[in-house]
Structures are given as C-alpha cells and as structure tokens.
Amino acid sequence: LAPRAFNHTWELLDAEELTREQEEEMLASSFAQRHHWYQVGTPRNWAIADWQVSRVAAVLGYSDLALRFGERSLEVSLEHGLDAFVRGFAHEAIARAAASVDDVETFTEHLELARAALAEIDDDEDRDVLATDLADMSER
C-alpha cells in the first residue's frame, strides 16, 4: 500500500490542474502513504514520506502543515544519519514552506543547506532532481 499511495500522490502532484476533489484526494493519499511507510518502511522511507506530505501541503497552501512535515523529515534524516539526498530534500521542504509565508530568513537558510547537500550526493540523477527543484524555487 505504501508505494502505491506514494506513487498515486506523485501522479496528482504532476497534474496540470486539479479539481477540489482531486486536491483532497492528494492530501489524503499523502497521509495514507506516510501512515503505511511508518508501519512497514525504514527511516529513509519515513523521511521521504514526511517530505511528500510537506510538498502536498505546500502545493495546496497549507503552510503550517508544510513546515511541520518538512521539519519532521529533517528530524528523521538527522536522527538516523540519512544520506544527503534525503537531507537535502528535507531542507528543500522547509524552504518551500517558508517561502509560502514570506519567511525570507528561514527560506534562505534552508535553501543554502539544501544546496550544500548537493555536493554530497554521489548519484548524478539524484543530484539533478534536487538541483532542479532548488532552481525552480530560486526563480520565484
């Protein structure tokens, strides 16, 4: 269930436009994947699950929720010594949440920490995924 809910949430995130019902479905699906990953996954899965909830919340305009789960993703990443890719995306989530409420200081701090994580990511594809998201945020 965890991977299916995670992938379904991504499909909705990638949609050009969402109806109100689809937005609600996306939010519910993000929480479903998180719940299931916390039952069957590893700390890496947990951090990524929290990141996805944060991303969905940010997209839907729930900045407090986005910040809460971005911070949770970072806590799990640090507590379990997770890799730079996961840690970088946790910082990205916090920066994205901060941007939505015009918290320039927090946005800048976590954007820079996410950028710093790029240098520690060995896999080119993973590094490019994070770099693309960070570039997108910088252009806003």
Predicted regions and their residues:
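Residue signature of alpha-solenoid helical repeat architecture, marking inter-repeat boundaries
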Residues: 3-4, 23-24, 44, 85, ...
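TPR repeat positional signature
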Residues: 5, 9-12, 29-30, 46, ...
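"A position-specific structural signal for the A-helix of alpha-solenoid helical repeats
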Residues: 7, 52, 86, 93, ...
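The canonical alpha-helical register within tetratricopeptide repeats
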Residues: 8, 32, 39, 72, ...
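Helix-turn-helix repeat elements of alpha-solenoid scaffolds
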Residues: 20-32, 63-71, 110
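Short coil/turn linkers that connect adjacent helices within long alpha-helical scaffolds
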Residues: 38-42, 76-83, 119-125
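TPR/TPR-like (Sel1-like) alpha-helical repeat modules
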Residues: 71, 75, 98-122
